[in-house]
Amino acid sequence: MANLKDIRDRIVSVKNTRKITEAMRLVAAAKVRRAQDQVLRSRPFADRLARVLENIQSRMQFEAADSPLLNKREVKTITLLAVTGDRGLCGGYNANIIKRTEKRYAELKGQGYSPDLVLIGKKAIGYFENRSSLYNIRATFKELEQVPTSEDAASITSEVLAEFLSESTDRVEVIFTKFVSLVSCNPTIQTLLPLDPQGIADSEDEIFRLTTKDSQLIIEKDAAPTNEEPKLPSDIVFEQSPDQLLNALLPLYLQNQLLRALQESAASELASRMTAMNNASDNAKELAKNLTIDYNKARQAAITQEILEVVGGASA
């Protein structure tokens, strides 16, 4: 059996590790709320922009619109935007996106297309750059804000827009993690370009808040509040032509779509980290409990051995 001092030192080490993982869990839980608030704050702009596009759509056929962002040309090159994080300790969050990107890349190559990658996050960059002979990397972005901002989305949007408009790529897809709940995050593929603003709809969001129960911090979920805005008047008059409006609004719509993907990915990363740290804390607690039992058994065995030696010496 292990030395008593070794077991005691390991118990102390495990308990200290549990303090760290518990602190990381609480920090991630608080940041999930911050990321969620960012999504809710950006929603009014997204809703109004969608309504304006819907109004324009009702007055013209998008298929007939003279906008390069809507043109569906023959597809030869497809750009994949892979969104991961800059840090680990978040379960399978980064690995799932990387696997999904590899699978999609192989699918497109097998179908005769020429895929390339735009990598967002250090984890994706590090993985695919180490395999640069197998993958064509177009651009990389790292060290974005923990809660993505419109500036982050704008820099990436400028890159993909330039490539699409110059016909260096014919389609752009984003692979990100859709935030479903604190325990469910799904890798998702969404086509960014060419744009198709039809069927715009916001799925129901959930909001999460820290509270206490039985002296323990817990997280409650609730439905996000929705504010019904009045629809734009049907007789509203636009000074510019529909084509001019589309050319001005569609880049904003694209940027908003990408921002939403970045925000959902950030929330998913934080939720995954919170879950991973919660599991680590539980495992550390169980390990400390088992080590304490081993320590007590070893201590009892040592005391029994000493008693036997004393009794044996007295008998002699």
Swiss-Prot record:
Cellular component terms (Gene Ontology): plasma membrane-derived thylakoid membrane; proton-transporting ATP synthase complex
Subcellular location: Cellular thylakoid membrane
Similarity comment text for this entry: Belongs to the ATPase gamma chain family.
Record keywords: ATP synthesis, CF(1), Hydrogen ion transport, Ion transport, Membrane, Thylakoid, Transport
PROSITE patterns documented for this protein: ATPASE_GAMMA
Topology of this chain in the membrane: Peripheral membrane protein
Any Pfam family: ATP-synt
Keyword Transmembrane recorded: no
GO molecular function: ATP binding; proton-transporting ATP synthase activity, rotational mechanism
Subunit: F-type ATPases have 2 components, CF(1) - the catalytic core - and CF(0) - the membrane proton channel. CF(1) has five subunits: alpha(3), beta(3), gamma(1), delta(1), epsilon(1). CF(0) has three main subunits: a, b and c.
Superkingdom as given in the UniProt entry: Bacteria
Function: Produces ATP from ADP in the presence of a proton gradient across the membrane. The gamma chain is believed to be important in regulating ATPase activity and the flow of protons through the CF(0) complex.
Name of this chain's protein: ATP synthase gamma chain
HAMAP family: ATP_synth_gamma_bact (MF_00815)
